[in-house]
């Protein structure tokens, strides 16, 4: 649902942010 989709997107963004550090 919406919650799982948002969590997936946030997870991807977090991985990208961590990779950029």
From Swiss-Prot:
Main location: secreted
Keywords: Amidation, Amphibian defense peptide, Antimicrobial, Secreted
Keyword Secreted found: yes
Tissue specificity remark: Expressed by the skin glands.
Gene Ontology cellular component list: extracellular region
BP GO annotations: defense response
Summary of the function given for this chain in its UniProt record: Antimicrobial peptide.
UniProt protein name: Peptide PGLa-R5
Species the sequence originates in: Xenopus ruwenzoriensis (Uganda clawed frog)
Phylogenetic placement of the source organism: Eukaryota, Metazoa, Chordata, Craniata, Vertebrata
């Amino acid at each position: 649902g919406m919650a799982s989709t948002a969590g997936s997107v946030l997870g991807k963004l977090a991985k990208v942010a961590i990779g950029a550090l």
